[in-house]
Amino acid sequence: VCDVDRKHREQAKRAVDDRYKNNNCKAYLDFRELIGRGDLDAVQLALPDHWHALPVIEAARAGLDMHGQKPFARSIKEGRAMCDAIHRYGRVWQTGSQQRSDYNFYHAARLVRNGRIGKIQKIEVGLPTGGSHGPAKEMPVPENLDWEFWLGPAPWRPYCDFGRGNCHWEWRWIMDYSGGQLTDWAGHHIDIAHWGMGWDTTGPVEIEGQGTYPESGLYDTPYEFKFTCKYKNGIVMTVANNKKIPQGTKWYGDKGWIYVKRGQLTADPMDVLKEEIGPGEIHLHRSRDHKQDFLDAIKTRQLPVAPAEVGFRSISVGLLGEIAMLTGRRIRWNPDTEEIANDPGASALLGRSYREPWTL
């Protein structure tokens, strides 16, 4: 186990030792020491977004398979570098977009994919609404935390109360580390929208929208947002926080609609939900348990239900929406070359500057 917080390290070690009734679990502060052991098959990564890229690339080079949390990456250039490393070294990757292993989401996506509501006219995706907070209160670094390592490639800043407690949760609302609810949930509901449309390896061509950002204080990610994504076939997907669009994914076809969120699947007409997919139709990967699907893929060397390219393309939509809102401009995106046309300012936001000594 590995963590920059000693309390977390010790807690994780105890959990493993208790499970195996011994004291053999090794605990590390530096992920490079764990990855470099030479006797591992796979690793599970649950890190702040700004720390997603470097450990993944390092683990791929070391020949390890990986289960990693969404969002896949904090920037598009990081995501592409991660995908390239995973593919180059032939590693299995499962993104933690566990809704793909939930029957309701799977069933909704396969019905849409097989034309049960006709030709798709538009898509709506609702994500959670964010929040704001007052000024940060600078504090001494907890003695159990390696703050320098926690920051890693992100810009340096003094340790603070993070608004509500410590750094292990509230980092999500600070752009140096995350994109707020938008990027936190893009890997869930945008991911399902893509699955139903067969867009797992592509993306939109035009993105524009607006976000509402805190005027002051520690948090600087948008707490409200709405943007549209136009795809090559002309279909427009609208993504917004749940005060504007109900949370979940909704496809509108010329023969009806299907809406799915956690704990709910509905449609008009309702009878469409009773339909099955025939032998000659499109069959999506059926996973009944997300982590078991990953373990099975390690053994078979087949793609799991949420492989690297899928995770990358899903978060790319959220990241492009972020860029469109930050610049206030319509973004013209080429999903094949992964370039923004005729906008150097927007293009600069495709990557992130790394603090020394870290490099991508």
Which residue ranges define each predicted feature?
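Rossmann-like dinucleotide-binding domain that binds NAD(P)(H)
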Residues: 148-233
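Acidic/polar loop patches that form or flank catalytic/metal-binding clefts of enzymes
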Residues: 119-123, 158-161, 199-209, 236-239, ...
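NAD(P)-dependent dehydrogenases' Rossmann-like dinucleotide-binding region
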Residues: 116-134, 146-160, 205-214, 238-241
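Non-transmembrane alpha-helical segments in soluble domains
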Residues: 13, 32-35, 44, 56-60, ...
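C-terminal helical cap and adjacent loop that interface with cofactors, partners, or active-site loops
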Residues: 177-201, 216, 224-226, 245-360
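A contiguous active-site-proximal alpha/beta segment in oxidoreductase catalytic domains
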Residues: 65, 72-149
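N-terminal glycine-/serine-/threonine-rich beta1-alpha1-beta2 phosphate-ribose binding loop
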Residues: 1-68, 74-92
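Conserved beta-strand->loop/alpha-helix structural units within folded catalytic cores of enzymes
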Residues: 45-49, 64, 68-69, 94-98, ...
